[in-house]
Amino acid sequence: MVDLKEKVFSYLEEHKEEIVKFLQKLVRIDTQVPPGLNYNKLCKVMADKFSEYGCDVSIYDATERYLKLSGWDLLGLEGPRSNFVAKYRGKTGKPILHISAHIDTAAIQKEGWTVDPLGGEVTKENPYGSSPYDLGGGYIWGRGACDDKGECVAMTYALEALHEQGVKFEGDLILTANCDEEIGGVAGLGYLIKEGIVKADYGIQLDGGLQGIGLSAQGRTRFMIRTIGKSWHGQMPVLGINAIEKMSKINVALNDYWRNVLLKRQKALPGIELPPQLREVGIDKIAAMLNIGTIKGGVQGATVPDKCEEEVLRVMIPGETLDDVKNEFISVIEGVKATDADLKYEVEIINSRDGYVMSPDHLYIQEVKGIFKEVLGRELPFLGTTGSTDMNYQVNDGKMPCFNFGVGGPYSRGHKQDESASIDEIVECAKIVALVYMRKLGIA
């Protein structure tokens, strides 16, 4: 086993050039969401690759029901919601290990990039900071490099390195590259697990960073707010009702609610830390959050706008229910309406998903902790996040013990301009994944 481990690790180190080329291929396929186009194209690339390893490969498009639950019309989604599934069958088929990464990316900002966001450029240095795992392998740039296409590559080459050594497992390995994680994952991993397409005994969620072992994440609910005004000539605005002005009042109230109520609503998770960048700003427990993400309204400066709409993300802590969150959210807006008789509004839930907490004491988690130390030479802390990942579907719906980690840190600038991934981190990630494959599935 030790000899096999060294062969696998050497294979990954020796094939960095191929790893980079494959990630470049994925980065150059535009899968930003919204709208979420080209999922089927990227799934085909994954299918071609995994067919080389003797996997059973399939592409599943989510059904109409899941499209509606995703917020299809509200978010302006387009194209099939394609999901890739590969099965590397073992001798006995037990246990079953499922690993997942997502193929969609955050939207690409129109300005502020110093590199082509779909270019996959490679440099030796990172001006935003170096990865602690940087051994001189360089950085690859583009939207999705670290979130989450680098992880798609890591799980791919972890299997390739084992396949090239002729490895066959006792158990079955299921690998999924799924869509729409950035908007809730309803038509992605949610669809695959809730429809019974993916069932497993253990899970790995490749999403996050290499700063720790992720065991918890918060739930989230996405709201759409609309204000309704009365259009009029902009030179006589007193005769109209300005929908943007009304939305501005709502936003003042929402920000007060976030800072004075939600941020104080914190919950400690025993044995689980928050990422250092949150602790640095005074948040050492998971906290309820709120973000006003988009706002649209008006047609021109000379017309009083009669419509305005915005999307708001409400991050939930364990114990909060969707009904509680919705009722409290609406009560904030009702408080504004009580002071403004002209305020007319609508609130709609785009989609929602619950958070999750894995116990640090679970045997699987303790085994994984040892694998991280074996590969990286040091123990990593158990982390919780104020974000949300598709791991909730594995834990809550699939009933799989699971953990998450991935590629990147603050220097990787996920969701920001100039996103990148450390090539050495992708290799380290792949080593960890390969060892989990070996240890949990067993060598036949």
Ranges and model annotations:
Residues 205, 209-212, 292-298, 385-402:
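Short glycine-rich, acidic/polar surface loops and turns
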Residues 68, 80-84, 94-173, 423:
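Active-site metal-coordination/substrate-binding segment of hydrolases
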Residues 251-259, 272-277, 354-402:
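Active-site-adjacent substrate-binding region
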